[in-house]
Amino acid sequence: MSSRGHSTLPRTLMAPRMISEGDIGGIAQITSSLFLGRASVASNWHLLQARGITCVINATIEIPNFNWPQFEYVKVPLADIPHAPIRLYFDTVADKIHSVSKKHGATLVHCAAGVSRSATLCIAYLMKFHNLCLLEAYNWVKARRPVIRPNLGFWRQLIDYESQLFGKSSVKMVQTPYGIIPDVYEKESRHLMPYWGI
């Protein structure tokens, strides 16, 4: 159990691999049956086959599915803008990832860059099916794909979802000199030094 009273991921999921083509590229293994990546990963038939991926969840409005017959495709038509209603898809996508896993398949969730939309959906899945609080789920995904950065509207929706699931929230929106941001971003920004030029 974690310090927040939530269980952590099973030990069998504790050592995922990261297959990298650079920080922004590549595919990150989030659990034994869940992968997160950018759109170019979904176009790599050999990579999908090699990872045992059977379902591709496309969280974009701008990128079409490849519709190869070997894979099941799910389209989640979302723009990467703060007011996009990603919360409407949390349960549907999480349930699909879980269903694919129960059938011994694997799911790739992708958006354009694998940074905001797809990361948000993976975080929601970890909260629902692995009983992680939002902070734990975010840190878990970020450790495997360091470039993730859900937009501020998605954070608000994740915070609401966590409150619905667990009756409390582990991440807060805070006022900073940069505007209102999730406290996890505020903690990250403390390590940044302003550069004023010389």
Swiss-Prot record:
Tyrosine-protein phosphatase domain residues: 26-167
Record key words, sorted: Hydrolase, Protein phosphatase
TM helices/strands, residue ranges: none
Keyword Hydrolase assigned: yes
SMART domains (alphabetical): DSPc (SM00195)
Record: active site: C111
Catalytic reaction(s) noted: O-phospho-L-tyrosyl-[protein] + H2O = L-tyrosyl-[protein] + phosphate; O-phospho-L-seryl-[protein] + H2O = L-seryl-[protein] + phosphate; O-phospho-L-threonyl-[protein] + H2O = L-threonyl-[protein] + phosphate
EC number: 3.1.3.16, 3.1.3.48
A Pfam family per the record: DSPc
A molecular function (GO) term: MAP kinase tyrosine/serine/threonine phosphatase activity
InterPro entries: Atypical_DUSP_subfamB (IPR020420), Dual-sp_phosphatase_cat-dom (IPR000340), Dual_spec_Phospatases (IPR052103), Prot-tyrosine_phosphatase-like (IPR029021), Tyr_Pase_AS (IPR016130), Tyr_Pase_dom (IPR000387), TYR_PHOSPHATASE_DUAL_dom (IPR020422)
One GO cellular component term: nucleus
Keyword presence, Hydrolase: yes
Annotated family: Belongs to the protein-tyrosine phosphatase family. Non-receptor class dual specificity subfamily.
Function summary: Involved in the inactivation of MAP kinases. Dephosphorylates ERK, JNK and p38 MAP-kinases. Plays a negative role in TCR signaling by dephosphorylating MAP3K7 adapter TAB1 leading to its inactivation.
PANTHER family xref list: DUAL SPECIFICITY PROTEIN PHOSPHATASE 14, IP21249P
Protein name: Dual specificity protein phosphatase 14
Species this protein is from: Mus musculus (Mouse)
Primary gene name: Dusp14
